A protein has these predicted regions:
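Alpha-helical transmembrane segments in inner-membrane proteins
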Residues: 1-161
Length: 161
């Protein structure tokens, strides 16, 4: 039907229009458990930034840590995308922004990225719902409009072009 097609279109561009506590509560539980599972690995992730051989020499089981990160990320992303659709640039921009604000320590980077990402998404959703009332823009359009220029700035800043 027409409403199902509209819903699918909004899902592919990212939308919180169909959000309900019935769907969100299990997602909050799963994402919180995934974060709580990763935070104790913050120090190991910090050591991994030195390189795999160095982290291994410092006692990190690199292979196990990689599996843990991949599993946690896959669970978190899978739950998030299944509810809100594909929303671009948040996962790319937010961790870099947190690094700029608070450094590279993963004990701050992991929860900081979650909190700043949530704040960015709430702001983008507010903009998407109020910009052209009574219509609603897909939130993915707003995050792309904010994220793409920021990501380009980051690339140019790193390469000093």
């Amino acid at each position: 039907t027409d409403s199902e097609l509209r819903g699918l279109t909004f899902w592919t561009m990212g939308s919180f229009g169909g959000a309900s506590w019935y769907l969100i509560l299990p997602a909050i539980i799963v994402i919180t458990l995934s974060m709580l599972w990763m935070i104790p690995s913050s120090r190991k992730l910090d050591l991994l930034q030195l390189g795999e051989p160095e982290a291994y020499r410092l006692g990190v089981d690199v292979k196990r840590l990689k599996y843990k990160v991949i599993i946690s990320s896959a669970i978190t992303v899978g739950v998030s995308v299944s509810l809100s659709g594909m929303i671009g640039f948040v996962g790319l921009v937010v961790p870099h922004l947190v690094r700029l604000l608070g450094g590279v320590n993963h004990s701050y980077l992991l929860p900081g990225s979650a909190l700043l990402g949530a704040g960015l998404m709430m702001s983008a959703d507010l903009i998407s719902r109020t910009l052209i009332q009574p219509a609603e823009l897909p939130v993915g359009l707003i995050t792309s409009a904010i994220g793409a220029p920021f990501f380009l700035w980051l690339i140019f800043r790193i390469r000093k072009i």
